[in-house]
Structures are given as C-alpha cells and as structure tokens.
Amino acid sequence: YDAIIVVTYLYYPAVKSIVRVKDKAIFIPTAHQEPFIHFKMYEEVFEAPKAYVFLTDEEKDLVQSLFHIEEKPYEVMGVGVTVPDNVDPDAFKKKYNLDNYIIYVGRIDEGKDCPRLFQYFMEYKKRVKSDLKLVLMGKAVVEVPQHEDIISLGFVSDEDKFNGIKGAKALILPSKFESLSISVLEAMTLSIPVVVNGICDVLRGHCVKSNGGLYYKNYFEFEGCLRFLHEHPEEYKQMCLNARKYVDDYFQWDDIMAKFDRIIEKVGE
C-alpha cells in the first residue's frame, strides 16, 4: 500500500497499528477536547503518522497545540452528507401531531449533556409562554423527564428523521465534545439552523463560520437563542439560507476527495 488511513485516536486498533505503519500512515484522529487526549501514552501515537486529515480547523488547532506535529503535512476537510431529494415535514408533523418544535437527533445520554438540555428546556417552559416542544430521536440511556412538551420518539426511520429535522425550528445539540457532528451538517443541508453548546469549539465554529446557528454556554444564553429564533423572523430566514450555503461551500464530496488525493500523493512521495 502507498498509504494506510487510520481513523479515530481513542481506540486500540489505532493505538497499536499507527506506530507500526507510521511512514505510510494518514491519521484522521477525530479528536476533541476531552480527558483522554491528555494521556501521555498518546504522544507516541500522534507523533507517528506521516500526514494528517482533520475534520475541522478547530480539531487541527487542538492537536497542533498538544503534540509536536507542526512539520507534518495535513489537509482540513469534513465529510459530505446525503439527504433525500424529497423531504416532507408536513407528513412528520401530521404523523406525530407536532407543530412548533426543536429536535435532538442521536444517543440520549449524559455524554451528550442531555440531562442539562432537559433541565434548560423545562426552565424555559416555566419562564416563557410558548407552545414549543422538544422532540428527541434516538436511544435513551438516561431517563427522559415526564413532561408534556418533551417528546421522545426512540429509533425512527430515515424518512421520519429527515422529515422531522426539516420540520423543526432548529436542531439542537447540547454536547460539549464533538469533532464534527453529522446531525448538524444534515440539518444545515436541509436549511435548518442549529443551536449548540458553545463550550464545544467545533460546534461553536460551525455557527460562527456559517451564521447559520446559535450557541449558548449557560441557561440564559439558551433561552436567548430560542427567543431569537422565534422573535426575529427575517433573521431566521437568512440563517436558514446561510446554513445551507455553509454546507455547499465546505462539505461537498468532490472537494473532499480531491483533498484526499493530495494527501495520499504526499505520503506516497
């Protein structure tokens, strides 16, 4: 092989393989700020590969700040996302008797900061007169509060997922630790703004670079995000356009594969 692509720094296959194939290794670490990346054992892992592929600028900055890899070639690219051509939000709303809602898509657990999302949303419902609901899609591994405005659908079909995202006021992602987030890119591809945890550099970066999302770091900023979406309709329309443009500009497969070709050529030289 001219090059061997190793994906995700955290697990055994990457840790053991990359030091053996380092002269041919292209490393896609999918790294984010978390305790594990600071373990001393990872110094050898991150300094081994010939080249890097980062999913975002924020990931690149993090890895370069932690390890001595300044001289290694790299490319920054995301991933492309594919959504159906025909999406029917009205069918989703009719099926589940929903109208005004925000949506969370993914594993419902503490690692994604879902308990804090529930806390913030219930506080919002106490403080703000609104018919807004929170719709959850995915496996719940933490308890979902019994609340009339929190709707947990469990696993759903791809059709329901995309219809549901398209019908939402926004997709919300409360996670503090993300290296990219496919669900955020899927929502933006469907011209749906996102509301994310601003503690996560990558998610905050999506919002800042696109002007297609909002971020929060505490309850009052969370409330402010939801109020803004509902109280500024013209700005909301522009956010929808901005979200789609961001994906079109930076997350297209043709561009991504061209970057892959370049980095593979560098490793093979």
State what each model feature region is.
Residues V53, K93-K112, F118-M122, C240:
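Conserved donor-binding/catalytic core segment of Leloir-type glycosyltransferases
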Residues K24-P35, Y42-V87, L98:
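Donor nucleotide-sugar binding/catalytic pocket of nucleotide-sugar-dependent glycosyltransferases
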Residues H206, F228, E235-D249, K259-R262:
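A short, well-ordered alpha-helix in the C-terminal region of glycosyltransferases
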Residues P193-N197:
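Short hydrophobic beta-strand element within catalytic cores of glycosyltransferases
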Residues K176:
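Aromatic "clamp/platform" in nucleotide-sugar-dependent glycosyltransferases that forms part
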Residues F162, L180-S181, L185-T189, L203-V208:
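Short alpha-helical segment that forms part of, or immediately flanks, the ligand-binding pocket
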Residues G138-N163, G167-A170:
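Nucleotide-activated donor-binding/catalytic signature segment of Leloir-type glycosyltransferases, i.e.
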